[in-house]
Amino acid sequence: NRDATHKGGYSIETINKAERGTEIILYLKEEEQEFLEDWRLRGIITKYSNHITLPINMKKNSPSTSVAPDSSDTKISEESSTATWETVNNATALWTLAKENIKEEDYQAFYKHLAHDIQDPISWSHNKIEGKQEYTSLLYIPAQAPFDLWNHEKPRGLKLYIKRVFIMDDAEQFLPRYLRFVKGIVDSNDLPLNISREILQHNKQVDSIRSALTKRVLESLTQLAKEKPEKYTQFWQAFGNILKEGVAEDFVNGDLLAKLLRFTSTYLKNSEQTVSLEDYVGR
């Protein structure tokens, strides 16, 4: 129950209840009536709780029908309606499923929904970590650069979930700036639900996840360059200039970054950046 003596407060009391379960009753201020609107509630649920384990149901009013006397016409009654329960959220999260149970087209469809992109990603990396820390990451490499990639004021980062509850967009603390083209999610089981961007900047768990995710992206790109060189060439043409920023910023991963660099060469007699440092040394 709301505590009438404290604005925004509440009270808890024990009552005799015929049915099992807990009821939470919210009292809204007059100027906040929009939160009673069906579309507003559904929007909040799908944004923040679309992937939690339990289904969230809302009543959906459907107009009732009646048959007019001496007529075969079915009419919709304007005065009465029947309420049915409808599940609003998905109650599943793609990244929580075992990789062997996820189809390639499912990964691609999730990326398009996540990144608002019509093209399939070049590659992705899906990992679940258990041990001192427990978290799941699903990271994508886009096929092309967005038009505002060089806008340094635009916030970029991963979507952060904690125990499948959406916390924030553009959590930039989980990857360095030179990997700002990466799209994806990180879902932690250890971070507090009330975490803020300020706390993310000074959190040892976040630093550890950032280090692991950075290395994972660079290793995925290394594997892509080795196994699918034509795909890596496509990546380099889109994001190579940004990846070069890492050479000056990230000394810890300098060796990995050096292997990913590509340059032009008079040996090939064209202006394309396709030659690695290893290629130069091998000649």
Where are these regions (language model features)?
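Conserved GHKL (Bergerat-fold) ATPase module
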Residues: N1-R283
